[in-house]
Amino acid sequence: DLAFTWQTGPLVASVVDVVESRGIRTAILDVSFTCHMPDCLEMPYQPRVRNAESLPAEAVKTATREDHVYRLGGNSCLSGDYMGSWKFDHELQVGERIVFEDMIHYTMVKTNMFNGIHHPSIALLHAGGELEVYRTFHYEDYRDRMC
């Protein structure tokens, strides 16, 4: 049997902090490229982010503050848990949602719980706006994978 999917659903993240080092602004998210989107680091593949323009990775090094260009960083302790450059039409704020389009098929198949990183819940957003949560992950899921 052959199966493939496309536009399976987004991975929704939140900005937990914005840091700047050597002129590079990084929005730290509550998801991890290493744990939730490893294909992005392995291929490399830069996912489409809703309401943002994908730029070459080097663009973040030359952007001005007014350009609203950010590197997006994951929440693991791995130093390479970040990706590329995205240009937004505004300054990102803590708590703001970042939507990675068409990522659920990568997120669910290749995911890992490196250092106990929390997994995103699996949910279905119905046409009428109702959010139905199918699965929420907890510490016990991490513990049981290790034992």
Question: What is the predicted function of each stretch?
Answer:
Residues 1-147:
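Charged (often Lys/Glu-rich) extended helix/loop segments that serve as interaction or gating elements
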